[in-house]
Every structure is written in C-alpha cells, then in structure tokens.
C-alpha cells in the first residue's frame, strides 16, 4: 500500500502536466470555409450629385460574390472563442440592360448585363460567444476584417439586336482603389459536433466596409450578406 501511495505521489505531477497539455491542445481548432454572398453597396454623396446617383440606382443591382479561406479558433473560456482567418473575397454588383455597341467593328447595337468584381484578401478577427454549447451549439459572432485590395475586373453578357451573344471579360483599373480597408463583420452561427474532433458550422454573416471603395466624388461602401459553411477540426 505504501508503494502504491508513493507511486501515486510521484506520478501525480506528470499526470497533471499531461492533462494540462491535452486541455491546451483542445483549445485550438482549424478549419476551412466557403460563403456565397449577396453583394451590393451604399452610396454617400453631396446634394449636387443627386441626378448621377439616381441614374446609378436605376441601372445598378445586387449580385453574387463569395468568400473562401481558412480560420483558426482558440477557446478562451467555456463560452468565448477568438477566431482569426484569411480569406479570398469577391465583392460584386451589377449593371443590367446597359445599351452598348458591337465589338471588332460590329456596329450592331444591343444590351448588356455587366458584373463588376472587386477582389480582396481579407483577415477577419472575430469573437464568438456560445449561447448553446451541447452536441448542437449556437453562437453570436462579431469583429472586424482587414481587407487588402488585389484587383478589379468586369464580366459582361452581351445580346446584340441581331440575336448574337457574347461574353466579355476585362480588367478596368480605372479608379484609384483604396488598398487597405477595414470592415465590420457580424452574425450568428449554428454548429454540430460530428465527432470529438470535428464540427460543422453554418453562419449567416453580414460584412460592411467602413471605408469607401475609392476616393471619388460619390463614395461607394460595399457590403454583403452571406451564409458561411465551415468544417473545423480540433488540434
């Protein structure tokens, strides 16, 4: 019995350290995610540009973009989690039924739907608060995103009056875009523990830029509403 007590005393610190190590490892998780987004913009402008804004509001419409990337989560305590990610983002909006001319010398007139695309590398920094923490878990997310501008492009679907159709890709580079933009990110999420290490998450998220797309007479602030789906694994 004495030997058993002595062995227990000797091994107690080792077991404690091992348990602490396991607990520390279980606080980290890493995952991949993808979010299809309903994307658009708000405009801020002086009163004397109202007529230009009215023209834009008639011809511009929301469009679909996406975010995709990886994220690392750290469980601070039972209900609070910090999340850091890196994502590729496509923000968009669209001009519909724009009157255009032909290409390559074709003078036939027609109509075009033109999608404008803005590409970013985004670094979201979030705090997740778990309101339910069982096999199914729910949480509220809030934070900021640091967005680095990459490039812009357009895709046009043209229909000419003679019935011909054409799809044209182009890079504009017309505006002097703000290279680094900070945005707000917020939403709610629902998760499910598939196993001890794996969980699936579905997160409706709202993203809003705090700075305009470019320095221009009419300031454009991009935003999106999406449903992010992610698979995470505890390390």
Language-model-detected regions and their locations in the chain:
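Bacterial Sec-dependent N-terminal signal peptides
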Residues: 1-33, 136-138, 205, 224-235
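Predominantly the C-terminal beta-signal and adjacent terminal strand-loop region
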Residues: 175-177, 181, 189-235
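Residues on the lipid-exposed face of transmembrane beta-strands in outer-membrane beta-barrel proteins
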Residues: 32-36, 68-74, 86-88, 123-129, ...
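Mid-chain, structured segments of secreted extracytoplasmic proteins
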Residues: 67-104
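Repeated loop/turn-to-beta-strand initiation elements of outer-membrane beta-barrel proteins
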Residues: 79-82, 135-136, 197-200
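Short glycine/proline- and aromatic-enriched beta-strand/turn motifs that initiate or cap beta-hairpins
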Residues: 19-71
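Extracellular/periplasm-exposed beta-strand and loop segments of Gram-negative cell-envelope proteins
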Residues: 40-63, 91-119, 149-181, 213-220
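Outer-membrane beta-barrel channels and translocator barrels
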Residues: 25, 77, 89, 132-134, ...
């Amino acid at each position: 019995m004495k030997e058993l007590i002595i062995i227990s005393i000797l091994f107690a610190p080792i077991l404690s350290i091992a348990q602490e190590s396991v607990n520390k490892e279980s606080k980290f998780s890493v995952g991949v995610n993808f979010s299809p987004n309903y994307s658009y913009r708000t405009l801020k402008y002086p009163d004397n540009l109202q007529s230009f804004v009215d023209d834009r509001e008639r011809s511009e419409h929301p469009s679909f973009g996406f975010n995709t990337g990886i994220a690392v989560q750290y469980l601070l305590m039972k209900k609070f989690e910090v999340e850091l990610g890196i994502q590729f983002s496509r923000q968009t909006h669209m001009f519909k039924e724009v009157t255009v001319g032909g290409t390559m010398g074709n003078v036939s007139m027609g109509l075009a739907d033109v999608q404008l695309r803005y590409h970013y590398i985004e670094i979201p920094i979030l705090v997740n608060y778990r309101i339910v923490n069982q096999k199914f878990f729910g949480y509220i997310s809030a934070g900021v995103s640091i967005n680095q501008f990459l490039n812009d492009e357009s895709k046009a679907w043209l229909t000419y009056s003679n019935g011909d159709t054409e799809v044209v890709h182009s890079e504009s580079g017309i505006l002097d875009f703000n290279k680094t933009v900070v945005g707000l990110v917020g939403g709610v999420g629902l998760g499910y523990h598939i196993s001890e290490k794996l969980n699936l998450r579905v997160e409706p998220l709202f993203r809003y830029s705090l700075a305009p797309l470019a320095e221009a007479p009419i300031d454009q602030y991009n935003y999106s509403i999406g449903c992010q789906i992610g698979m995470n694994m505890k390390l």
